[in-house]
């Protein structure tokens, strides 16, 4: 395993540990989730470049689309919670039910 892949896996692991550590705050969780998605994007891009397969070249773009959708939904939820309660605690998500 090359050092590049090890660094990307280390970035993913650190983001995952941050997600587990700061799971009570929505903003920190969203930032850690973005770090995980960015490391996955870089990993799939490197794999697509190394395999030279035309079928796998679309995978990084699909992952980037899902990351953008996740960021938009997370930001909308963060704004909604911040405007309503003034805090970004995840335990406030139960209070958003109809």
UniProtKB/Swiss-Prot annotation:
Family that this chain belongs to: Belongs to the complex I subunit 4L family.
Reaction(s) this enzyme catalyzes, per UniProt: a ubiquinone + NADH + 5 H(+)(in) = a ubiquinol + NAD(+) + 4 H(+)(out)
Listed PANTHER family: NADH-UBIQUINONE OXIDOREDUCTASE CHAIN 4L, NADH-UBIQUINONE OXIDOREDUCTASE SUBUNIT ND4L
EC class name: translocase
Function according to Swiss-Prot or TrEMBL: Core subunit of the mitochondrial membrane respiratory chain NADH dehydrogenase (Complex I) which catalyzes electron transfer from NADH through the respiratory chain, using ubiquinone as an electron acceptor. Part of the enzyme membrane arm which is embedded in the lipid bilayer and involved in proton translocation.
Protein name: NADH-ubiquinone oxidoreductase chain 4L
Gene Ontology biological process: ATP synthesis coupled electron transport
Subunit relationships: Core subunit of respiratory chain NADH dehydrogenase (Complex I) which is composed of 45 different subunits.
Keyword Aminoacyl-tRNA synthetase belongs to the record: no
Ranges that cross the membrane: 1-21, 29-49, 61-81
Keywords, sorted A to Z: Electron transport, Membrane, Mitochondrion, Mitochondrion inner membrane, NAD, Respiratory chain, Translocase, Transmembrane, Transmembrane helix, Transport, Ubiquinone
GO cellular component annotations of the record: mitochondrial inner membrane; respiratory chain complex I
Bilayer topology: Multi-pass membrane protein
Its EC number(s): 7.1.1.2
Chief localization: mitochondrion
Coiled coil: none
A GO term, aspect molecular function: NADH dehydrogenase (ubiquinone) activity
Annotated compartments: Mitochondrion inner membrane
InterPro entries documented for this protein: NADH_UbQ_OxRdtase_chain4L/K (IPR001133), NUOK/Mnh_C1-like (IPR039428)
């Amino acid at each position: 395993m090359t050092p590049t892949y090890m660094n990307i896996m280390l970035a993913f692991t650190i983001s995952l540990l941050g997600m587990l550590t700061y799971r009570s705050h929505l903003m920190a969780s969203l930032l850690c989730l973005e770090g995980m998605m960015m490391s996955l994007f870089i990993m799939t891009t490197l794999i697509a470049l190394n395999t030279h397969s035309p079928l796998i070249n679309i995978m990084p773009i699909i992952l980037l689309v899902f990351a953008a959708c996740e960021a938009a939904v997370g930001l909308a939820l963060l704004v909604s919670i911040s405007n309503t309660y003034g805090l970004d605690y995840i335990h406030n998500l139960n209070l958003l039910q109809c």
